[in-house]
Amino acid sequence: MLPSTSLNSSMYGNGALNSRDAARHTAGAKRYKYLRRLFRFRQMDFEFAAWQMLYLFTSPQRVYRNFHYRKQTKDQWARDDPAFLVLLSIWLCVSTIGFGFVLDMGFFETIKLLLWVVFIDCVGVGLLISTLMWFISNKYLVKRQSRDYDVEWGYAFDVHLNAFYPLLVILHFIQLFFINHVILTDTFIGYLVGNTLWLIAVGYYIYVTFLGYSALPFLKNTVVLLYPFAPLIVLYGLSLALGWNFTHTLCSFYKYRVK
């Protein structure tokens, strides 16, 4: 079972809900409603989800302003429409098949890679990161320890999805066009291009994650979420100095998985 969170009150944590509202808006009820809509495609707003994906690249702050609007109108920070998750899953499947093609994998090897990437890299790691950030934000970043000031687990998961999408596009789509003819050529230009794409992708993940938690008015010191930029830049510099090609390591790992 996913960790549950206490109910946030009205906008910015002020006020209190009556018992009937609280029962209707428990974490379990929200989760059930979300999962139920996961199989009702006609009820999903794919146009709005696609709009969010676009703005995650051009203006991610606008995406989180919509989360504020949802809190005002539906009394929850997390998405109640799984359309974004569905589109992200489609992107992940298509790009992973592309990876299998670029790495010259057979049909069954590509299917095996797809299962690994979807259920372990995306779902498994995503649940782990979301739970970790949910715990850290509630334990250390909340301004006032109260049941009225609580980061929803669903919101932590949404922040991860928001940050994961640009990383996915950069590393699993854009990078595909450079792997065989540039990145894996065992030259300085090769690992410069590849590692720079990794720097941009992971850096964007950190930045979008920071924006997600800094958008919550009851959190403090969210700037600490930008601190991973320092070791990231150091690692990038060391990789260029040592000739360590991140993409080559990823491709070798993918091939090892499907043996």
Swiss-Prot record:
Residue ranges in the Cytoplasmic topological domain are 1-82, 137-163, 209-222
Instruction: List the ranges whose topology is Lumenal.
Output: 104-115, 185-187, 244-259
| Keywords, sorted A to Z | Acetylation, Golgi apparatus, Membrane, Nucleus, Phosphoprotein, RNA-binding, Transmembrane, Transmembrane helix
Listed transmembrane segments: 83-103, 116-136, 164-184, 188-208, 223-243
Membrane topology for this entry?
Answer: Multi-pass membrane protein
Regarding protein family, the annotation reads: Belongs to the unc-50 family.
Its recorded name reads Protein unc-50 homolog
